[in-house]
Swiss-Prot record:
Superkingdom: Bacteria
Key words, A-Z: Methyltransferase, S-adenosyl-L-methionine, Transferase, tRNA processing
Recorded metabolic or biological pathway in which this protein acts: tRNA modification; N(7)-methylguanine-tRNA biosynthesis
Record: residues binding substrate: K145, D177, T214, R215, Y216, E217
Matches recorded under Gene3D superfamilies: Vaccinia Virus protein VP39 (3.40.50.150)
The keyword Phosphoprotein is assigned to this record: no
Gene Ontology cellular-component terms listed: tRNA methyltransferase complex
Gene of this entry: trmB
InterPro entries: SAM-dependent_MTases_sf, tRNA_(Gua-N-7)_MeTrfase_Trmb, tRNA_methyltr_TrmB_bact
Catalyses which reaction(s): guanosine(46) in tRNA + S-adenosyl-L-methionine = N(7)-methylguanosine(46) in tRNA + S-adenosyl-L-homocysteine
Name of the protein in its database record: tRNA (guanine-N(7)-)-methyltransferase
The keyword Oxidoreductase is annotated on this UniProt entry: no
GO molecular function: tRNA (guanine(46)-N7)-methyltransferase activity
Length: 237
C-alpha cells in the first residue's frame, strides 16, 4: 500500500497506547470532550503540510504552556486552575491517562486546557517557533535498561524541536526520581540550548512553590526514591 504521507519521518514509538479497559464514564469523556479540547490540526492525516497551529486564534493570545506526558493529569489540572490567564497544552499518548485527565477537567471546571492524545514529536512539528512560555517534563518513562536510554525524552530527537518551540528565556521544568535520568538530563538538556538555574542544593531537592505531588511521586517516595526537581531556561540568542 502506498504511504499517503511520503514525507512523514519514520518515528518509532515505544510504550503502551492503552492499558486496562476504560470505564463507561471514561469512554463517554473521550467521545464527548476530547475533540473539543484539541489544540488544532496536529495529526498527519489532517495536516499533511505541517502548517503551524494558529495558537492566537485558538487561545486568544494567552501565554502557552506545555506539559509532555501528563500521566493522570493531576499537575496539568492544578496548573490550569492556578493560572486561568494561561493556556496549557497537555500531550499524552496513553489513552487511559487521557481519559483520567478528561474526568479531572470536568470535575475542576477548568477551561484553559487543550489535549493532544499522541506523540509529542508530531505536536512539535506544528508548534510555531518561540510559542511556548513554559514546559514541563514530570516523571517521564525512565527506560531503565542501558540499551533503551535512547528512548528517553531527554535526547536530541525531542530536545531540539522543544527548544525551537520555546521562546527565549522560557522555563523548562524536569522532575524525576531516577538517578541515571538525572545524569542524562544534566548532560543533554544544556547541550540543547538550556541553562540550569540551580544555585543551591535546595533548588533541585525541594519542589517548586506551585507544585502538586502526583500519584507517581507518592509511590516513588513510599519506595524510597528521591525526587529531583530541575529547572532550566532557554538561552537567549
Amino acid at each position: 500500500m502506498t504511504d499517503p504521507h511520503p514525507n512523514r519521518p519514520h518515528r518509532n514509538f515505544y510504550g503502551r497506547r492503552k492499558g486496562h479497559d476504560l470505564r463507561d464514564s471514561q469512554e463517554r469523556y473521550l467521545a464527548e470532550d476530547l475533540a473539543k479540547l484539541s489544540p488544532g490540526a496536529v495529526d498527519w492525516d489532517v495536516n499533511p503540510d505541517r502548517t503551524p497551529l494558529d495558537l492566537k486564534e485558538r487561545f486568544g493570545g494567552k501565554d502557552i504552556w506545555l506539559e509532555v506526558g501528563f500521566g493522570g493529569g493531576e499537575h496539568l489540572v492544578h496548573q490550569a486552575a492556578s493560572n486561568p490567564d494561561v493556556a496549557i497544552i497537555g500531550c499524552e499518548p496513553y489513552i487511559n491517562g487521557v481519559a483520567m485527565l478528561l474526568g479531572k477537567i470536568r470535575a475542576a471546571g477548568v477551561g484553559n486546557l487543550a489535549v493532544y492524545p499522541g506523540d509529542a514529536r508530531d505536536l512539535f512539528d506544528v508548534l510555531p517557533k518561540g510559542s511556548v512560555a513554559k514546559a514541563f517534563l514530570l516523571y517521564p518513562d525512565p527506560w531503565p535498561k542501558a540499551r533503551h536510554h535512547r528512548r528517553r525524552f531527554v535526547t536530541t530527537e525531542h530536545l531540539e524541536p522543544l527548544h525551537r518551540a520555546m521562546r527565549p528565556g522560557a522555563e523548562f521544568r524536569v522532575a524525576t526520581d531516577i538517578e541515571d535520568y538525572v545524569r542524562q538530563t544534566m548532560e543533554e538538556v544544556p547541550k540543547a540550548g538550556f541553562e540550569w538555574l540551580a544555585e543551591a542544593a535546595s533548588d533541585w531537592r525541594e519542589p517548586w512553590c506551585d507544585w502538586v505531588s502526583t500519584r507517581y511521586e507518592q509511590k516513588a517516595l513510599r519506595e524510597g526514591r528521591v525526587p529531583h526537581y530541575m529547572t532550566f531556561q532557554k538561552r537567549s540568542l
